[in-house]
Amino acid sequence: MTNSNRIKLTWISFLSYALTGALVIVTGMVMGNIADYFHLPVSSMSNTFTFLNAGILISIFLNAWLMEIVPLKTQLRFGFILMVLAVAGLMFSHSLALFSAAMFVLGLVSGITMSIGTFLITQLYEGRQRGSRLLFTDSFFSMAGMIFPMVAAFLLARSIEWYWVYACIGLVYLAIFILTFGCEFPALGKHAQHSQAPVAKEKWGIGVLFLAVAALCYILGQLGFISWVPEYAKGLGMSLNDAGALVSDFWMSYMFGMWAFSFILRFFDLQRILTVLAGMAAVLMYLFITGTQAHMPWFILTLGFFSSAIYTSIITLGSQQTKVASPKLVNFILTCGTIGTMLTFVVTGPIVAHSGPQAALLTANGLYAVVFVMCFALGFVSRHRQHSAPATH
């Protein structure tokens, strides 16, 4: 593979995470405007975003098989057509049913693209490079989470319709579409060469279950928290711009945290530092919820930084539970995390309708506490120390 081809594929991976990050994170910023557009209460409107998350979950789950049947380049190009149709549906329809369908299609497209992006990084890089590249790729999710809430706040403050936010997100997929030209993708399934000997199967162990629960609770807690921060902040009397700044601050420090921890983690036992980070994140989230308005930006900045390495560390630890890294095992943990994404508004919507946004934030805080317990329990059963003695974390 040529170096320019590798660079193009790596950028497709980076942008695939940015696309999903933008779609998922911008929800909290535009939800109130979309609710007004359809004349619905915010808590009812949040349920329709479950279609976005369901699309992401279904596509990540199915793409484990789809990647072996349909070439990756074909999937990405067809995804661009679907993206254009979905954004057009949002712009030109006033039907809630069509809005839900468009959200589902956006979820399908971003889920397929993200699973292809993850696969490309694991194929292109090995050993130490794979871990650091995966963490750097994941930082594009956060980068989009920092940029697009600011874009949304800029557009909404100027009374520009909410659907233009999704048109801006579509530009990320346009970049992916352009990169597919003159680019060779790894072949899979019937398109691949079958020269390698089969790898012996290994039992996963109970540690994988702890990590799967941690992944689900972490993503559900994180998105449940960040999706309702704008409504919570507005309820405290903050402006839309200030509420958006809190979300952007979180993802900005999350992004810097990922870059910092891609260097820091190699000096520590991964399970131990993961337990410490999960505990700190739970405490910092509690301080944000119960603290004064003046201290909220500082708490959300430190929360973003210290929670940034948790999800990628969970996935890395999962891959180290077997002697040979299992794509199915990693996909299982990713799927559990995506289930957390799908459940975000299923769980928090009724809580907000009944008890308000603060109750949703406290629920998210409880889920972070569960992540801490799972990471602590993992210390007694994890196999990563025996499997990664010569390798890096």
Curated annotation (Swiss-Prot):
Lineage: Bacteria, Pseudomonadati, Pseudomonadota, Gammaproteobacteria, Enterobacterales
Entry keywords, A to Z: Cell inner membrane, Cell membrane, Membrane, Transmembrane, Transmembrane helix
Transmembrane segments: 11-31, 51-71, 78-98, 101-121, 134-154, 162-182, 206-226, 245-265, 273-293, 298-318, 332-352, 361-381
HAMAP family: MFS_TsgA (MF_01044)
Record GO terms (molecular function): transmembrane transporter activity
Keyword Protein transport: no
UniProt entry tagged with the keyword Cytoplasm: no
PROSITE patterns cross-referenced by the UniProt entry: MFS
Organism from which the protein derives: Salmonella dublin (strain CT_02021853)
Main location: membrane
Family: Belongs to the major facilitator superfamily. TsgA family.
Protein name (Swiss-Prot/TrEMBL): Protein TsgA
Membrane topology annotation: Multi-pass membrane protein
Gene Ontology, cellular component aspect: plasma membrane
Compartments, as annotated in UniProt: Cell inner membrane
Superkingdom in the source lineage: Bacteria
